[in-house]
UniProtKB/Swiss-Prot annotation:
It is an enzyme of class 4 (lyase). InterPro entries: Aldolase_TIM, RibuloseP-bd_barrel, Trp_synthase_alpha_AS, Trp_synthase_suA. It comes from Staphylococcus aureus (strain bovine RF122 / ET3-1). Belongs to the TrpA family. This is Tryptophan synthase alpha chain. The active site is at E31 (proton acceptor), D42 (proton acceptor). The alpha subunit is responsible for the aldol cleavage of indoleglycerol phosphate to indole and glyceraldehyde 3-phosphate. The gene is trpA. The keyword Lyase applies. The keyword Manganese does not apply. Tetramer of two alpha and two beta chains.
Length: 242
């Protein structure tokens, strides 16, 4: 099975240009961050990118507008990573309707409790927008079974400080956890935690069905040339599916 490459970008003024570049250079699904004033789940790089986007005047309305006008330029699926407050403020039904109309494949909502995610799935499943399940490495087995049994799209396994030493190897316990999730899952199980280098990718791809790269992609769009970004994406893609 081909491994999924899921890069993350901040929804900002360069959203369509950046997403198009990613989709033309190996991305299977693109995660688009919706800037929010209190992003509790974001690291410093993504938090700073979100603050810059807010200063640019970026809102969820702007992101929807861009996807509506130019989403056909993005040659792969895309999901929104957003906090529930934004959905609530927009209006749940209106939000799901807009996601459907702008081609959004799914939603990653890091501050959404499992029970609330189930209500949203039941209420708005007819819009065809997946709610992606997040599983932390600290989640107990009983809860994991519950989450996995209701998962759709893909499962996003998240942890912090998962690498051991400087060689980019991930902790054996982390790999065992991913394998145990895969054993009971009916959708791909992807890993997204501090993955930056081809070495990280080579190590974690042995167990995960795909990878999410966030902060490193955001940093490179900020400081690298287009050619350097493409070279990096190609190195990740080659390592992932070698």
């Amino acid at each position: 099975m081909t491994k999924l490459f899921i890069p993350y970008i901040m929804g900002d003024k360069d959203l369509i240009e950046n997403a198009t570049l990613l989709s033309e250079n190996g991305a299977d699904i693109i995660e688009i961050g919706v800037p929010f004033s209190d992003p509790v789940a974001d690291g410093p790089v993504i938090m700073e990118a979100g603050q810059q986007a807010i200063k640019q005047g970026i809102t969820i309305d702007y992101i929807f507008e861009q996807l509506e006008k130019h989403g056909n330029q993005i040659k792969c699926q895309y999901v929104l990573m957003t906090y529930y407050n934004i959905i609530c403020h927009y209006g749940e039904q209106a939000f799901f309707e807009k996601c459907r109309d702008t081609g959004v494949y799914g939603l990653i909502i890091p501050d959404l409790p499992f029970e609330l995610s189930q209500r949203l799935k039941q209420q708005f499943s007819h819009y065809g927008v997946k709610i992606i399940s997040l599983v932390a490495m600290t989640t107990d087995d009983k809860r994991i079974k519950e989450i996995v049994s209701h998962a759709e799209g893909f499962i996003y396994t998240v942890t912090m400080n998962a690498t051991t030493g400087q060689n980019g190897a991930f902790h054996p316990e982390l790999k065992r956890k991913i394998e145990s999730i895969k054993a009971i899952a009916n959708v791909p199980v992807v890993a997204g935690f501090g993955i930056r280098t081809p070495q990280h990718v080579a190590d974690i791809k042995e167990v995960a069905d795909g990878i999410v790269i966030g902060s490193e992609i955001v940093k490179r769009f900020k400081s690298n040339t287009r050619e350097e970004i493409i070279k990096y994406l190609q190195s990740i893609q080659q390592t992932l599916n070698n």
